[in-house]
């Protein structure tokens, strides 16, 4: 019987700050489900510090300060180091060498057309002076994905162009040098509300600088305070006024987090979210009541995360060892892929006895 290709996941986050409920709804919760599904042979989770430096080169302390924060967030949401290999990107030198070889397979104009790159450049005001490392990061990402032979890459919809770039590099490499790299598939979130949660102020994106995030590590009191200050329908002034759902942050969060069990527990006069929405739209339902319900929903989700984090915070040496061992395993895996890439490109001169034989024959003729 023909051997099936191992199912391997690669995913990760930039350590530019603590992780928040947007990360949790958009990717972390799904990662834990995938990890525990038993469907995957290997899972690699990368703390992408080298990638974070592409737009934080003048502030490496920011990255250094958040390595452990992100690791603690991973462990607190249920990432299990016995099932998922957590590693630090900069400690896998093979990724840089792979990036260097892949750069020869992509044109500058192709990178410029990448919609994700264009959007990120605009967001960071890099239009006139784009750091080369930042401009190059779709190629770096292709190295990350292919180094671990990832078959599945769970990402948000906004990252689709990035994965398309990776697939193009894989196809180009394999067509030029022979079948070597694994062609990955994207795995999108199933719940559309999870694709990108807005900030609590209604802004399109949660951002540490805007102060509109709910962090996974925040206290119960701080979470409640932020929920009660959330942006809703500005025209819903009196309880009897009909309310709008579009752009109403509270309902966006309920879409992402609530289920019928929450209604039975905290708001039994409604069976499900559709009933609550209908009441809000026709009027007679106040924002405070809806916010209190959302607070209960979020506290139920975040309480075990806080408890696990408190335990890991008492054993930072243990977390350090998880990262160190994970990075060693990742480097071994990437080294094997790099060896195969160099063999395919025929630049493995000292590992290939045929090279010396060819040269001896050439110069003895």
Locate each region found by the language model.
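Generic N-terminal leader/processing signal
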Residues: 1-5, 147, 340
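N-terminal Rossmann-like or analogous alpha/beta NTP/dinucleotide-binding catalytic cores
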Residues: 2-143, 261, 300-302, 306, ...
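Pocket-edge structural micro-motifs
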Residues: 11-13, 88, 149, 199, ...
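A broad detector of the eukaryotic-type serine/threonine protein kinase catalytic domain
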Residues: 14, 51-52, 148-153, 211, ...
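Structured ligand/cofactor/substrate-binding pocket environments in proteins
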Residues: 19-28, 43-44, 49, 58-63, ...
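Residue-level "edge-of-site" marker
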Residues: 87, 153, 355
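Conserved nucleotide- and phosphate/pyrophosphate-binding catalytic cores
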Residues: 161, 167-365
């Amino acid at each position: 019987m023909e051997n099936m290709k191992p199912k391997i996941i690669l995913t990760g986050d930039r350590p530019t700050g603590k992780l928040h409920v947007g990360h949790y709804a958009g990717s972390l919760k799904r990662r834990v489900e995938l990890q525990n599904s038993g469907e995957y042979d290997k899972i690699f989770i990368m703390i992408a510090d080298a990638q974070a430096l592409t737009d934080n080169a003048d502030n490496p302390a920011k990255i250094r300060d958040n390595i452990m924060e992100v690791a603690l967030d991973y462990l607190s949401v249920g990432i299990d180091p016995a099932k998922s290999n957590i590693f630090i990107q900069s400690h896998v030198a093979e990724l840089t060498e792979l990036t260097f070889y892949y750069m020869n397979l992509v044109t500058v104009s192709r990178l410029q057309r990448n919609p994700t790159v264009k959007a990120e450049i605009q967001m960071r005001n890099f239009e006139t002076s784009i750091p080369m490392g930042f401009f190059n990061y779709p190629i770096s990402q292709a190295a990350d994905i292919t180094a671990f032979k990832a078959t599945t890459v769970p990402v948000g919809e906004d990252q689709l162009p990035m994965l398309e770039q990776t697939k193009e590099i894989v196809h180009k490499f394999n067509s030029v040098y022979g079948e070597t790299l694994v062609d990955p598939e994207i795995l999108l979130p199933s719940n559309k509300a999870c694709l990108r949660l807005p900030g609590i102020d209604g802004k399109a994106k949660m951002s540490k600088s805007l102060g509109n995030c709910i962090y996974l590590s925040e206290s119960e009191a701080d979470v409640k305070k932020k929920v009660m200050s959330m942006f809703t329908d500005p025209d819903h002034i009196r309880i009897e006024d009909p309310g709008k759902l579009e752009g109403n942050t509270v309902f966006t969060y309920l879409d992402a987090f609530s289920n019928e069990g929450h209604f039975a527990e905290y708001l039994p006069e409604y069976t499900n979210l559709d009933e609550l929405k209908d009441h809000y739209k026709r009027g007679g339902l106040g924002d405070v009541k809806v916010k209190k319900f959302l607070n209960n929903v979020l506290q139920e989700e975040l309480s075990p995360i806080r408890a696990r984090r408190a335990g890991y915070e008492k054993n930072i040496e243990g977390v350090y060892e998880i990262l160190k061992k994970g990075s060693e395993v990742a480097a071994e895996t990437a080294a094997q892929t790099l060896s195969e890439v160099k063999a395919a490109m025929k630049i493995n001169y000292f590992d290939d006895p045929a090279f010396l034989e060819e040269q001896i024959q050439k110069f003895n003729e």
